[in-house]
From Swiss-Prot:
Residues 102-224 form the MPN domain. CDD domains: MPN_DUF2466. Keywords: Hydrolase, Metal-binding, Metalloprotease, Protease, Zinc. It comes from the Bacteria. A motif (JAMM motif) lies at residues 173-186. It comes from Shewanella sp. (strain W3-18-1). Pfam families: RadC (PF04002), UPF0758_N (PF20582). Disulfide bonds: none annotated. This is UPF0758 protein Sputw3181_0338.
Length: 225
């Protein structure tokens, strides 16, 4: 039975309008984005099958286009709708960390970085630029791809810091594997960046590694002195 044949008020869109999005399951929310299913599967059933196929919403949103679009009932249009929803969530998170906001709450920073980086299927190295009062200047994604000590260039970081007149920075990157534990390469990158920034009297406050549901802070581990 298609969703249009369900009793009035029972479809996911009706439920969202009547009760709010928080009352919908993951499959129902996804069905609202998908809008329709295919022969033999309504939108909710299709949503459930996609979540099951990829092992969760995060994996679905991180999956490359070719992996998503090869499945019955999902083409470029539906893939674009899902990616647009994911990007909107990132931009809402970015608005929560506005220019000029003072970073006095570590949980706010963690939540922001989680929303920015957890749903990427590739590695991203980014920098949060702060002024002398630790107010936000800008969040910038610097490098994408395989992040190792050879692919992160301290001179580019220093150049950006000078351009934006930052007094302190927090660097971060994600592990698409979902495991946030830093590697030895991560520690080498951090040391090189700390030394490079010290030459221009800019403090490296932290390096945060973002996993699936956790963030590892170098500062909390005592790895940044």
């Amino acid at each position: 039975m298609g969703i249009k044949d369900w009793p009035e008020g029972e479809g996911p869109r009706d439920k969202l309008l009547q009760k709010g999005a928080a009352y919908l399951s993951d499959a129902e929310l996804l069905a609202v984005l998908l809008r329709n299913g295919l022969a033999g599967l309504n939108a909710v059933d299709l949503a459930r099958s996609l979540i099951s196929e990829f092992g969760g919403l995060r994996n679905l949103l991180c999956a490359p286009k070719n992996q998503v679009c090869r499945l019955p009932g999902v083409g470029p249009v539906k893939y674009a709708q899902l990616q647009a929803a994911a990007e909107l969530a990132r931009r809402v998170a970015q608005e929560n960390l506005q220019r000029g906001q003072v970073l006095t709450n570590p949980d706010l920073t963690r939540d922001y970085l989680m929303r920015q980086l957890t749903d990427r299927s590739y590695e991203v190295f980014a920098i949060l630029l702060l002024d002398s009062q630790h107010r936000v200047i800008q969040f910038v994604e610097l490098f994408r791809g395989t992040i190792d000590s050879a692919s992160v260039y301290p001179r580019e970081v220093v150049s950006l810091v000078l351009e934006k007149k930052a007094a302190a920075v927090i660097v971060c990157h994600n592990h698409p594997s979902g495991i946030a534990e830093p590697s030895q390469a991560d520690r080498r990158i951090t040391e090189r960046l700390k030394n490079a920034l010290a030459t221009i009297d800019v403090s490296l406050l932290d390096h945060m590694v973002v996993g699936d549901r956790e963030i590892v802070s170098f500062a909390e581990r005592g790895w940044i002195n």
